[in-house]
Structure formats: C-alpha cells, structure tokens
Amino acid sequence: MTCVLKGCVNEVTVLGHETCSIGHANKLRKQVADMVGVTRRCAENNCGWFVCVVINDFTFDVYNCCGRSHLEKCRKRVETRNREIWKQIRRNQAENMSATAKKSHNSKTSKKKFKEDREFGTPKRFLRDDVPFGIDRLFAF
C-alpha cells in the first residue's frame, strides 16, 4: 500500500499505518485539521505537532495530543487540570449552600411568595452564569 499523502509514492512499511513516515503523518494531521478548521497544536510542551482529529459520520473528535510517545503524559496533565476545575466548582457550590443555609430559616415567608408568583412554562437554564465552570478553558482551541 502506498502513502495516502498527496504526491508521495513511497510504500507504507508499518502494518496499520496510513503514511510512510512520521513527518508525513504530521502533514496528514495538518491537512485534516485545516479541513475541519482546527488550529490547535499538541498539549505537550515543545512538541509543535498537530493534534489528532478523527472524523466520524456526523461529528469529529479533536484530541489534546498528537498521539506520539507523550500521549500518556498529556492525558494526565489534562485530567489533573479538569480535576482542579471540578474541585473549584464543588468549593463554590459548598460556599453557596452554606450562604443559603444561613438565610433559609429567616426567609420562609418570602419563599412562599416567590412560589406563588412563579411563572410556569419558562425554560430552565442549563448553564449558570454566576458559577465559573471553566468550560471556556476546556474547549479552547
């Protein structure tokens, strides 16, 4: 089988690979990333390779790493960053719960008024504005 990169006529030497060399694999990743509009590079420091993009039927998956030898290191770094974000979210929720618990025994009459004036049929909010989830950092390209 020949290399799938345009203009290359070399044979693929490794079973299961699509390109003949590592350099051509990065060029293929760059072509796929340009095709779907992804400009992100590998999460590993001083790597500079393009991330892996897997195109499915209706969606495409963008990974944080290029898939070379430091894939496990990148995965651990992303997991620790996500863990820190979730700790911050839980900390903010605990602070909000303690603040509302202090107010709840004094404002029972106002809760009843609020329930009576409540409009039904309004949509629920799925993402809150007042709690920093860190979602913008998770999906930053």
Curated annotation (Swiss-Prot):
It comes from the Viruses. The keyword Kinase does not apply. Keywords: Host cytoplasm, Host nucleus, Host-virus interaction, Inhibition of host innate immune response by virus, Suppressor of RNA silencing, Viral immunoevasion. A motif (Bipartite nuclear localization signal 1) lies at residues 75-91. Its main location: host cell. Disulfide bonds: none annotated. It holds the Pfam family DUF728. Residues 102-113 have a biased composition (Basic residues). The keyword Translocase does not apply. It is found in: Host cytoplasm; Host nucleus. Weak suppressor of RNA-mediated gene silencing, also known as post-transcriptional gene silencing (PTGS), a mechanism of plant viral defense that performs sequence-specific inhibition of viral mRNAs expression. This could be used by the virus to infect efficiently the host the meristem cells. This is Suppressor of RNA silencing. It comes from Tobacco rattle virus (isolate PpK20) (TRV). The lineage of its organism: Viruses, Riboviria, Orthornavirae, Kitrinoviricota, Alsuviricetes.
